[in-house]
Amino acid sequence: GNMLLSGNVNHGTITSSGQNAAGILCYTANMGDDWQLNIEDCENTADISSEGNVGGIAGFTAYYKTDEAGSSFNIQNCKNSGNLSSTTTNGYIGGILAVDGFMQTQTTIDSCENSGTISFTKSWVMQENELKTENDDGEKEDASLFTLSVMGGGIVGRIGEAVMLSVDADKPDGQEINKKDALVRISNCVNTGALSYEEPQKG
């Protein structure tokens, strides 16, 4: 099957208490083998906020298939200028796409632009013992490094297992960059939006 979203524009503010929100296409999952999904010449100018994942154009995509799917997903010539925010401490924000959860699906994002800000607005509260780490002598001391469970990107917030399944992903090689048979290709995209998050706090 084929699905095309072309020339769509959203100017209305979106506020979601659910898991996902996006300016054009919120959620796509298990679309089936040999499907082609294309989003082109679409634009979001409105602010979008959610308690979960947020994408300026597309929100959450998933097709958990580990063998050849014959499917494709393309976003081309799309723009987001709306400010994107999430109150989660376990989610993703992308100026164009929040989450690419397709596994064996050829995914292309080309000639897209994000100028909206990306912000995680909920502070990450930790207990006193979680804010400490153990040094080489086994003594507890204040931690100097934290790993937040949130990810934000000017173009894409998160790319899942497709990276592992792509062209020689386990063997870094400059010659493998831009291979046409790579599962995920992002090209000619620009981000000028700022990224911010709340610092961890003691609970």
Where do the language-model regions lie?
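Surface-exposed loop/turn motifs in large extracellular/passenger domains
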Residues: 1-203
